[in-house]
Regions:
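Glycine-rich nucleophile elbow surrounding the catalytic serine of serine-hydrolase chemistry
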Residues: 101, 173-183
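A catalytic-pocket lid/entrance helix-loop region that shapes and gates access to the active site
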Residues: 139, 183-185, 190-291
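Generic beta-strand/beta-sheet core signal
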Residues: 120, 172-174, 197-198
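Cap/lid segment of the alpha/beta-hydrolase catalytic domain
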Residues: 87, 92-166, 209-210, 217-220, ...
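Catalytic-loop region of hydrolases
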Residues: 17-89, 93, 102-105, 233, ...
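N-terminal signal peptide c-region/cleavage motif recognized by signal peptidases
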Residues: 12-15
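Bacterial N-terminal signal peptides that target proteins for export
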Residues: 1-7, 199
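Alpha/beta-hydrolase fold nucleophile elbow
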Residues: 164-175
Length: 353
């Protein structure tokens, strides 16, 4: 007879620990510096550098550490260990964008649910990718090493504090954190029992090439104001809805649909019910594959049905720094020469039919 006990999480009423929280500071090594090891009482916590208080936290052992797997590394991590009712599990938290800070909100949520949890700044401070220039090891830290080193150190601290390894170890991250989760799975397949890789920003350079392709239009009149998005969306829905054999207000076969935006071009003066010739060109670029000068496809296209979310692509003359930083600092390693999208025109991505 098979019995299952998976209906409720097991909470371990940890009252006695293998060693006191403060003694975890003695676990330093040549590559690990423990900068904080103290018990935080139940209540609210406002981490240094943050203006947002984390409410309703249970008491926990808070450990902060600096990791230096290479001489040029500067990885900051925190590990939070419940003082009581640990559920026996470890949850590592991923970072978004270019990282540069710890995901305290997500750590707090995990702690409230009984997890031992950890997060890292990915080896640098701040949302920019400027840390990459002249520091190839820091780029490796950001890509995957910081997350791995954090996980190894977190498990070491868990073992020292509770006297046992976690029963299960999980990863949770979205966007950049999803990308990190996929890399941890491929490089360190035994590190986690489960990985939540939400909306992973994978092959990011290829997808972000579209951002630059749109920005090669220097004429401000090429940018489509958000007030026109509903009109464009209605036209796309009309053209694509029935491609799956059923007209039901849903686009379920976007791969079968190619919209001719010239049909929306203004016959006379500009208005909210039409596109200028330059705006037509922008719409065509957004919904066409982006390729190199040799014809290699970098990004297939933005699919029909996404028009109401075009603001990041068609809403201004400069791409967000998040995307521009990939080319400014990582590809070209030239923060001055590639400071504006227009200066990338020496080898711009192009649109293919």
């Amino acid at each position: 007879m098979l019995y299952t006990t998976a209906l409720f999480p097991i909470l371990l009423p940890v009252a006695l620990h293998a060693q006191p929280c403060e003694r975890l500071s003695q676990l330093a090594s040549s590559t690990v510096s423990i900068t904080l090891a103290k018990v935080v009482d139940a209540g609210n916590l406002t981490p240094a550098g943050s203006t947002n208080a984390l409410p309703n936290l249970p008491p926990f052992c808070r450990v902060a550490a600096d990791l230096k797997p290479t001489p040029d590394s500067d990885i900051h991590i925190e590990v939070w260990l419940p003082m009581a009712q640990w559920n026996g599990k470890f949850l590592a938290i991923g970072s978004g964008g270019w990282g540069g800070s710890l995901s305290y909100d997500e750590m707090a949520d995990a702690l409230r649910r009984g997890y031992a949890t950890s997060a890292t700044d990915d080896g640098h401070t701040g949302p920019s990718a400027s840390f990459v220039v002249g520091h190839p090891e820091k780029l490796i830290d950001f890509a995957y090493r910081a997350e791995h080193e954090m996980t190894v150190e977190a498990k070491t601290l868990i073992r020292a504090f509770y006297g046992s390894d976690p029963r299960y170890s999980f990863w949770n991250g979205c966007s950049g954190g999803g990308r990190e989760g996929l890399l941890q799975a491929s490089r360190y397949p035994d590190e986690f029992d489960g990985i939540i890789a939400g909306d992973p920003a994978n092959i990011r350079r290829n997808s972000w090439a579209l951002e630059l392709a749109v920005q090669t239009f220097r004429d401000p009149e090429a940018y489509i104001p958000p007030a026109k998005y509903p009109m464009i969306h209605r036209a796309v829905l009309e053209a694509c809805d029935a491609k799956d054999g059923l007209k039901d207000g849903l686009i379920e076969a976007p791969e079968r649909c190619n919209v001719d935006f010239k049909s929306l071009q203004c016959k006379a003066s500009d208005g909210l019910d039409c596109l200028t010739a330059r705006q037509v060109q922008t719409a065509q670029t957004i919904t066409s594959p982006v390729a190199t000068k040799t014809g290699k496809i970098l990004f297939p296209r933005v699919e029909p049905g996404t028009e109401l979310r075009w603001s990041r692509l068609a809403g201004g003359p400069q791409p967000a720094d998040l995307f521009l930083d990939e080319f400014r600092y990582v590809v070209y390693q030239d923060p001055i020469g590639t400071g504006e999208a227009s200066t990338l025109n020496a080898t711009p991505p192009r649109r293919t039919q």
